[in-house]
Every structure is written in C-alpha cells, then in structure tokens.
C-alpha cells in the first residue's frame, strides 16, 4: 500500500513537472519561433498618416509604428529587414493576433483595463488624446455646439465610448456612425454624411485640409502599447523591456514622423 502511494505521489509530481515544463516552453515558444523562422510578423495599420500609411507608388507601408516594428525586429533578430508587415484595422488586429497570423500588433492600440484582460500590452510607446475634425463651414467651436451631431468613428475603437461619455457630461446627445477605416470616415465627412470625424488627434492631423479643422477639445488620453497574446508571458516581457530600453530611440522616431 505504501509502495502504491509512493508511486502515486511520484506520478503526480512527474505530471506537475511536465505541465510546468510544457507551460514554460509555451511561454518561450513565440520568441524562439520568431528566431527559428528568422522573421518577425507585425500587424500595422496602412491608412494612418505619420503612423503607418501605404505608399501607393512603392506599395510599402511607412511611418512611425513601422519604424518601431523594424526596431523590434532588429532587437530580436539583429536585422530590421527581417520583418513582415500585415495590414490591420481596429476590427481585425485582435483576431489576427488571436489566430497567430501576426506575432505582435503595433497599430495605435489603446491600452484599456478591458483589453488588458485579453491581451498583453507593453509600456506605452506613445500617448495622445481623442479629438474632433469638423468642416469649417459648420462653425463648431467645441463639442458643446454639436447637439444631435452624427460623429464618424472607427469600428471597435475606444473613441465612441469616450465621446459618448463626454457628451453626456455636458448634457447633449450625439449619434455615431461606425466605419471600417479612417479614409472612409474622412470621405463621409467631406460628403456631409457625418458632422465630425473623431479619433486620436495625431491621427486627425494627417486628414486636415483647407476645408476642415481640429477643434481644441481633447478627450480621454490614449496610451498605445505593443500587443502580444496573453499566453506568451516571456515574449510579453521581452517586448515590454524593449520599449523601456529603447525609449529614447522611439521618441526620436516619433519626432522624425512629426508626432
């Protein structure tokens, strides 16, 4: 009986050790797989001036977040050219990370408590605030002038909630129309199908023209983090350390792109 109990304890211990070993391998697997395949796959946007915008002439995506992604590739693989960029938007970036299509997402992904329960976020690499782009002919001076206005926002973004709460605080009602990408919102604004285009101010800067302006209002500061899967703690730590250790370089890249 004692012999059987000893065997049972040994089996339980062995099983626990196997599970721990398996979990450790899983945690380190992403970083090792990137090194093994010799390529980092990063989800970035392709419609955000300054951050990540498709160059129609070359077919390349260029911008601040692309350069941050290249810096990460250099950190992991020693070569910033060992990278593959996958175009994402606010609606697709999470699912593409979930299904393994990308190793990480660097795509104006705002850090929120709700999102941190689903994904790992690095320390912020950039901070901004939400704003409103409107047509000058509307003569809006602030959100307070926009009672009943229809505001264009991106699908699955934090903007709708932030503007909705701000409007409620000042006692006005606004409506929202959701779009798959930023150019679609700007087109709707130009066609007067929406009264405002709302997203982070530095993004709006890329869409201002002689007929539009950004209102002085700022809403709910946004912090962007590099996003990885929740089950990759070792990779998440590597990415977080990368952001901390390369802060000066990342800040310089932001300035390079006019942010």
UniProtKB/Swiss-Prot annotation:
Major localization class: other
Signal sequence residues: 1-26
Keyword Transport recorded: yes
Domain of life assignment: Bacteria
Intracellular or extracellular location(s): Cell surface
Alphabetized Pfam families for the sequence: SBP_bac_3
Record-level GO cellular component terms: cell surface; extracellular region; outer membrane-bounded periplasmic space
CDD domains referenced in this protein's UniProt entry, alphabetically: PBP2_Peb1a_like
Keywords of the record: Signal, Transport
Gene Ontology terms: biological process: amino acid transport
Function according to Swiss-Prot or TrEMBL: Common antigen and a major cell adherence molecule. Most probably involved, with PEB1C, in a binding-protein-dependent transport system for an amino acid. May be involved in binding to intestinal cells.
Family, per entry: Belongs to the bacterial solute-binding protein 3 family.
PANTHER family: ABC TRANSPORTER GLUTAMINE-BINDING PROTEIN GLNH, AMINO ACID ABC TRANSPORTER PERMEASE
Protein name: Major cell-binding factor
Native source organism of the sequence: Campylobacter jejuni subsp. jejuni serotype O:23/36 (strain 81-176)
């Amino acid at each position: 009986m004692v012999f059987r109990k000893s065997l049972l304890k040994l089996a339980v211990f062995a099983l626990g050790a196997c599970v721990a070993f398996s979990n450790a391998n899983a945690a380190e697997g992403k970083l090792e797989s990137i090194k093994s395949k010799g390529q980092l796959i990063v989800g970035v946007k392709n419609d955000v001036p300054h951050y990540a915008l498709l160059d129609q002439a070359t077919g390349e995506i260029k911008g601040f977040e692309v350069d941050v992604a290249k810096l990460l590739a250099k950190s992991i693989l020693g070569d910033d050219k060992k990278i593959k960029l996958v175009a994402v938007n606010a609606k697709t970036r999470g699912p593409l990370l979930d299904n393994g299509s990308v190793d990480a997402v660097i795509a104006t992904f705002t850090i929120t408590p709700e999102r941190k329960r689903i994904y790992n976020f690095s320390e912020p690499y950039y901070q901004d605030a939400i704003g409103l782009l409107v047509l000058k002919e509307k003569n809006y001076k602030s959100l307070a002038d926009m009672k009943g206005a229809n505001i264009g926002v991106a699908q699955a973004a934090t903007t709708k909630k932030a503007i909705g709460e701000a409007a409620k605080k000042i006692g006005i009602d606004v409506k929202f129309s959701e779009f798959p990408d930023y150019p679609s919102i700007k087109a709707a604004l130009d066609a007067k199908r929406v009264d405002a285009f709302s997203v982070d101010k530095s993004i709006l800067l890329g869409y201002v023209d002689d007929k539009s302006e950004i209102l002085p209002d700022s809403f709910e500061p946004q912090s962007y983090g590099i996003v990885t899967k929740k089950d990759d703690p070792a990779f998440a730590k590597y990415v977080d350390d990368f952001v901390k250790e390369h802060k000066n370089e990342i800040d310089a890249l932001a300035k390079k792109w006019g942010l």
